[in-house]
Design a protein with these regions (language model features):
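Membrane-embedded alpha-helical bundles that constitute the cytochrome b-like, heme-associated redox core
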Residues: 1-227
Length: 227
């Protein structure tokens, strides 16, 4: 028997959909800024080849990138702070933060299952182990982005913070690495949403999902095991 089940409260959905365009703008404007001093390489190759900049028309737009970055970074920070505060006030953090080291093992099992290398579907609550590890890591990455961003933005006034990351270049390297991490997360996240189907996507739009005895997408849940 199928029933409607509330999965995501309105506050969580708002934070999610506000963060999506903000993060996109921050990444995009960050690449516009990076163009002016593209120092990172993979061996002999630049991280972003010249054709990437010309194809996407993001070359010679340093001023635009800085203007966008310095405006939207405050909105990104405010949205992130409010989200973290909400998770603690509402108790949502209990479902998001890994409870023990076993969660990391279970997260690996989830990855193997998603790659069709493990037959047994993992037991999950509202979030599976891989989601708990990933979403907690994203929050930590957000904090890292803010700190390294401030270290780059005000290296003289916040010299102590800049030095914590090994100086200006160290802070910029960490900031850049975190940005690449966001891009990789976004790609995997979109693929996972597509594989999970409309029911999962709808729950993040309207808050409700269609549930049955075996749980969403046929995965066993803690509730169904109790029954």
């Amino acid at each position: 028997m199928q029933t409607l089940k509330l999965k995501h409260l309105v506050a969580v959905r708002w934070f999610h959909w506000i963060n999506f365009p903000l993060l996109f703008i921050m990444i995009w404007s960050g690449i516009l800024i990076y163009w002016a001093f593209p120092i990172y390489r993979i061996g002999p190759f630049r991280f972003f080849p010249a054709w990437v900049y010309s194809t996407l028309h993001i070359d010679h737009r340093l001023a635009n990138g800085m203007a966008l970055h310095f405006v939207f970074m405050w909105l990104f920070v405010v949205n992130g702070v409010l989200y973290v505060a909400y998770t603690f006030i509402s108790g949502e953090w209990r479902m998001l933060v890994p409870r023990s080291l076993d969660t990391f093992r279970d997260a690996w099992y989830v990855v193997l299952h998603d790659l069709h290398l493990r037959g047994d579907p993992p037991v999950q609550g509202k979030y599976n182990a891989a989601q708990q590890v990933t979403y907690t890591a994203i929050v930590a990455m957000g904090i890292g982005s803010v700190l390294t961003g401030l270290a780059i933005y005000k290296p003289a006034q916040l010299a102590w913070l800049t030095m914590l990351f090994g100086g200006y270049r160290g802070a910029r390297l960490v900031h850049f690495a975190l940005t690449i991490g966001y891009i990789l997360f976004f790609v995997v996240h979109v693929v996972q949403v597509m594989l999970a189907g409309w029911n999962n996507f709808r729950s993040m739009v309207i808050g409700w999902e269609v549930s049955d005895e075996t749980g969403r997408s046929g995965l066993k849940t803690e509730d169904s095991l109790v029954k």
